[in-house]
Amino acid sequence: MDHIRNFSIIAHIDHGKSTLADRIIQVCGGLADREMEAQVLDSMDIERERGITIKAQTAALSYRARDGKVYNLNLIDTPGHVDFSYEVSRSLSACEGALLVVDASQGVEAQTVANCYTAIELGVEVVPVLNKIDLPAANPENAIEEIEDVIGIDATDATRCSAKTGLGVEDVLESLIAKVPPPKGDPAAPLQALIIDSWFDNYVGVVMLVRIVNGTLRPKDKIKMMATGAQYPVEHVGVFTPKSRNLDSLSAGQVGFIIAGIKELTAAKVGDTVTHAAKAAAEPLPGFKEVKPQVFAGLYPVEANQYDALRESLEKLKLNDASLQYEPEVSQALGFGFRCGFLGLLHMEIVQERLEREFDMDLITTAPTVVYEVVQSDGSTIMVENPAKMPEPGRIAEVREPIVTVNLYMPQDYVGSVITLCEQKRGSQINMQYHGRQVQLTYEIPMAEIVLDFFDRLKSVSRGYASMDYEFKEYRSSDVVKVDMLINGDKVDALSIIVHRSQSQYRGREVAAKMREIIPRQMYDVAIQAAIGAHIVARENIKALRKNVLAKCYGGDITRKKKLLEKQKEGKKRMKQVGSVEIPQEAFLAILRVEDK
C-alpha cells in the first residue's frame, strides 16, 4: 500500500487540467501513442467543445520513479465547475492529494479557490503546479505570490511545467510522490467503499467508480448500499487505465469500478458507501448528501407529438445524470412538457444542449426559476418551483427566497462596475479583500437574480476577467410577487414570472412591450396586460389589421359606406370572441432578455 498514490487535479476552466492529465497518462504509458487523443478523459463531445469536465473519470497508472520503485498512481479527474461542486467534493474525498494547477500567465481564479478550499477542508494534501510556463506571458513569481496570498499554502517550491510541450511533467509526478501520503486503510476490515461516480452502460448496467477505504472486494461477493439498503451480487471489479481492465479483487487504498447488474442509476448514488451484505460495516463514510436541484425550468417539445420522445430522452439522460430531476407538466400555452430541476445554470445549458444534440429534440424552454418557500395564511409551508403554482396573494403569509453567497474575483480596475452590478441585483456586500492586483468580493445575492443573466452580465462589465462561484446559504423572507401576463384577458401561464415587488411594475411593462413587438398583428385588437393579483400594472395594445372595405365604393351615398364599415366591425367583434392568439416561441425567450434597470 505504500506505493499507491491517489490524487486529483484542481484547476480553473482552461488552465490546462485535461492536457496535464493527458501528459501524465502518456508518461506512465497508460495508452499506446496511437490511442492518445486530446483530452482523453473528457468522453462527451460537449465536454471537449466547451473545454470543461462534467463527469469524473479515473486512470490507474504505474510509474517508475527516479528512486527505482514502481508506484501505482490513481488519477481521479474532477469536474471544475461550481454547479458540480458536490461531485468535486466526492472525488476529492477519495484522494490523499491534489495537484493545484495554476496558469502561470493568469494566476488564481475563483473556481480554483472554491475547489481548493474544499480540498483543504477534506484534509487533502495540495501540491501547487504552475502550468503554461512556455508562454511568453507567463509570470511564475506573480502566480506563486497569488497562490500564497489567496489560498494560503506554501508555493515557493511549486513545480513548473508545460503540459502542452510535456516539459517538467516528470517533475510533477516526482513531487506528487514525495508530498502526497499513501492511503491508510485495512484490507481485512469490513468493506467500506465510497462511490465517486456512477454511469449507465448499455451492456452491463450501472458502472460504479469507487475508492476502497477499508476491506477487500471480489467478484461474486454480495454488496449492500448503505443509503438505500439494496443488495446486489458483484459481477466484475477492475480499474481503468483509461481503458477498463478486470481484476480478481480490489482492496483498501485502490480506486476502481464495480459492475453489479444494477439497472437504476438512482440505486448507486454518488457519495454513498458500499459494504458487504453479510459482514456489513458499522457505519457509512461521512459526507453523503442528497443533491437538491436549485434551478427549475419547463422544457416543452415544439411539436406536440414529440412528447413521448422527449420523455424517453430525459429518461436516458437521467441514466447518466442522477442529479437531473423532472416531472410531467401541462401548460395551457405550450401543451404537455416537463418541469426539470438542475444543479445550476451550466447544468441546465448542458442538459438542453445534450437533448438537442444527442436526441435531436426541438425544445421550448421557459424562464428558469428558483424554489420559493411560501408560508400560507393557514400556517402550512409549501415549496413553489413553478410560478403557476404560486397561491393567490390573499392566501400568502410570507414568501422566503433562496439567498446565495457569491465569491467574485477580478482585477481591481473592474471593482466599481462589478459592485454596481451586484447592487442592481439586490446584493448586500459581506467582504472585500485585496490580493495584489486581484480583488475578492463576497456578496449575498438572491438566487433568482443570479439565475436570470448574472453570469453573462458579470463577464460583460468586467470584459471577461471576473470569475465567480456561489453556494446556497439560506432562505430569507422577501417581498416577491407573481406577475401574470394576460392576452385578451386570458392568463398565459408560461409567461408568469416571480419578481421582487420593487421591480414588478418595471418588469411587467418591459415584458408587455416586448410581447407587443413579437406577437404578430391579428384581424382584431389584442390587449396585452401585466397583472399582480387583480391589479393591472401595464397594458399594451396591438392594433388590428383591417381590409379597406370601402375600396370598391366610388362616390355614392355615405350610408352605403357606413353599412360596410358596420358590417366589418361586427365581424371583428365576432372574431375576437372565438379567436385565439398564437404566441410565437420568441415571446417566451423575451422574458429572459428583459434587462433590469
UniProtKB/Swiss-Prot annotation:
Protein localization: Cell inner membrane
GO BP, sorted A to Z:
positive regulation of translation
First-tier enzyme category under EC: hydrolase
Lineage, top-rank taxon, reads Bacteria
Q: Keywords for this entry?
A: Cell inner membrane, Cell membrane, GTP-binding, Hydrolase, Membrane, Nucleotide-binding, Protein biosynthesis
Database matches in Pfam families: EFG_C, GTP_EFTU, GTP_EFTU_D2, LepA_C
Give Gene Ontology CC terms: plasma membrane
Question: Which parts of the sequence bind GTP?
Answer: D14, H15, G16, K17, S18, T19, N131, K132, I133, D134
Domain annotation tr-type G: ranges: 2-184
The cross-references to HAMAP family, in alphabetical order and at most eight, read: LepA
NCBIfam families linked to this entry? lepA, small_GTP
Q: Which family does it belong to?
A: Belongs to the TRAFAC class translation factor GTPase superfamily. Classic translation factor GTPase family. LepA subfamily.
Name assigned to this protein: Elongation factor 4
- Originating species: Burkholderia cenocepacia (strain HI2424)
